[in-house]
Amino acid sequence: MKTILVIEDEETVRENILELLDAEGFEAIAAENGRIGLDLAQKHLPDLILCDVRMPEMDGYGVLTGLRSQPATASIPFLFLTAKAAKTDLSYGLELGADAYITKPFTLAELLDAIAKALP
């Protein structure tokens, strides 16, 4: 079973994503901010990370930068799920090493397609 870490500060959004992942047969773990997410990623080494950009403690860009700087987490597929839809935001996220940048609102099909493409 593949493990996916969801880093999202909005509880309703986080819980909805967790339910969707569970229904699709993934093991999902969650963090409510970037700092906790970075810690959980280093501890659990998930197969994939879904992360918001704007969050307290540490934003998604900081999480991705931290993950990519550590050998144990550098190659974990990383997808941004965010309301930040400007082309500059997309470009910046991909330049930092994100595997995909999905803007909210997104459909279940879009999310599952991005996950399928990113998972090894």
Question: Language-model features: where?
Answer:
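Conserved acidic carboxylate
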Residues: 8
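Two-component/phosphorelay signaling modules centered on CheY-like receiver
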Residues: 11-29, 118
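Alpha4 helix (beta4-alpha4-beta5 surface) of REC/receiver domains from two-component response regulators
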Residues: 15-18, 62, 85-100, 110-116
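Helix N-cap/capping motif at the beta->alpha junctions
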Residues: 30-39, 60
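Short amphipathic alpha-helix used as the core "switch/output" element in two-component signaling
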Residues: 39, 61-74
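Active-site beta3 strand of CheY-like receiver
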Residues: 44-50
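Receiver (REC) domain active-site loop signature in two-component systems and cognate sites
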Residues: 55-58
